[in-house]
Amino acid sequence: MNQTKNSGPKKYFNRYVALLAMAGDPAFTSFLEEARPQVVQMGFYGPQLYAFGDTELGSGYPMSLPVRGVHEVLDWQKQFNQQIHDIGGKVIGHFSMTIAWGDPEKNTGFFESYNGDSWHTELLGPKPVDQIDDLVHKQPDGQMIVGDRYGFPWVAGCSNNPNWRKLHRKMVEVAIIRCDVDGFVSLYNYNHGCACDYCNQAFRAYLLDRYSPKEINSKFDIDNLDSFRLDGTLGKSPGWIDPDSPHPVGLQIEAMRFSQSSWKQHYDEIFIKTGRKLKPDLILGSWNHLGFMKHHERNVMPKEMWGCDEDLLWYSTGAGTGTVANGDAGVRMLNLKFIWELSGHKLPVLGRYEGTRTRASIAEGLACQGPGMGLYCNWKDPDGRKAFIDYFHFAEEFQSYYHPVESYAEVALVFPRQAILKGNDQPVEHFRKIGQFLMDAHILFDVLSDQNISVERLDQYRGIVLTDTNSLGERQAELLAEYANQKNPVIVPLDSEGAPNFIDQLTAHEKVFLVALGDRAKLVSVLRDEIYGGVSTFDTMWTVRINAYFQTERVVIHFVNYNRIESKDNGPANESPIAISDVGVNLRLKDSNKKITEVTFLSPEIPYRENLTWNQDSDRLHFQIRSMLVYGVVVIDIAP
């Protein structure tokens, strides 16, 4: 069931190139002409540009500006954007929400620009305040918070500071009007524990809007809200509970939620209200950090804000890639499923901090309704270049099989967001492990947030796997019991100590199964044996990840093979995939009265295309894939 979290239509694209450091080489444009991406992410339009654009520092990483001078960079980006428009693509640029590079002691970067004679009034108007320290994150004593990244000192603008937002609005206007950029990806969506007056005033108002003074006292141990001040530890984002903090867990959670809500309000003001007023079809994304299902910049954000009116949800996975030898192949596909669910089925992107598994990285994005390969496009490397061109041409040729689609998943794995909102992140570890089990066993599953449990959503699936019961509401437990009454299995963790009493009524049901976290065999056997009519099965290596989608009169199944010869050598030439063969498929059809007319295997690699031999037995379809290297798509056509 397609979800909606937009005031307008959702955008879709899956041919996407992203570079953080800019590529000024004309050969890059030639590569793009050949690869034909729909969207290119490159360029800087926020505080970074105005901090380093007029200095030699801008030529180094991470910006690698191709020319020097703010006006010169804007002109270069305008020309580049036009070149991409000419070949049918769009360009989205980077925009820092907080960090502005510069050393306050040496008066470099943003400080040199703001404090000196080089402030670009002709672009940004008069300075909104006299001093930078009236724009940025502050310590409780009023001093600026100063950090370091890429060897550069930085300060961070405050999302609750109206003057910082005003400056950002002007930067967005310049980017759109001057450079004709097609969208933005926000960077550094952080709160470093700001305790400025704006944050204190906004946080007090935030609490009063949600709680009575009596509740504020009893829940958060705040006697006098008027005199309460943030202490530099509260509200950090990304962040999590500090068990040694003197503050109650509830206050720590509320402070993080406040920070993340403030960031979203800041984001909406500059990009949606300002940016989309100038360009209604502006493509909007945000670059956040998830690792493997860890705490991130939206971990306690209100549900209704999560990805609202955004198009692209980028989450970096970190540099850890996992190894086949250690039983880790493509586990971060679980991240993509999580993002797709929490965002309301927006475009999920993984920022992979490695440039070796180019084909697998593109393929996993394509297989999860997103654009692949969020970082490190090795366009100068012959193997990397070929991978992008081959896969993009494949996605372009068979675009109709990618979008629009509905999920064909048979099982839902419930993400325990309500537990997180109560300060308990232990169930997330359960979610990670069970998610890996299900992927290894080739169970067709979606992620379902516990906040989205409803009759409509439950009815999409033949089985439900819970990772936490302690934070379920009574109505949710009733819905799950009604679901089990329809002979659908519900799996719950064996250790449910501390769960509300009404959970006992749920677990007493004959179709509710208590399974220990580490009992992988029982988990899979319950799904295969207790789901009426069984589940689809796939006879292939555990290193293959499988997703399936439904279109009108068609089922589309994606296969991504992560198996490879692993070595210490990097680069696309060392991806070294190991082909799989004789993949047996036993697909359960949703309607046994429908007749299959054709089954076709497609791939950007040999054998490219094969018409498969198949056999339909009532609601079961049997076929075999002879061979596949990294990525393959099976298209099953159904008679009307």
What is each stretch, according to the model?
Residues 245, 265-269, 273-295, 306-640:
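Carbohydrate-binding surfaces of carbohydrate-active enzymes
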Residues 33-76, 99-109, 192-202, 300-301, ...:
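Aromatic-lined carbohydrate-binding/catalytic grooves of carbohydrate-active enzymes
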Residues 31, 98, 107-109, 116-329:
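Polysaccharide-binding and catalytic clefts of secreted carbohydrate-active enzymes
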Residues 2-31, 43:
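Boundary/entry segment of secreted carbohydrate-active catalytic domains
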Residues 18-34, 58-89, 165-168, 265-269:
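Aromatic- and glycine-enriched glycan-recognition loops and surfaces
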Residues 30-36, 81-88, 303-308, 339-343, ...:
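Acidic (Asp/Glu)-rich catalytic clusters
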Residues 19-22, 42-44, 51, 93-97, ...:
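A cross-domain feature marking catalytic cores of carbohydrate-active enzymes
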Residues 13-25, 153-167, 352-353:
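Active-site mouth loops of central-metabolism enzymes
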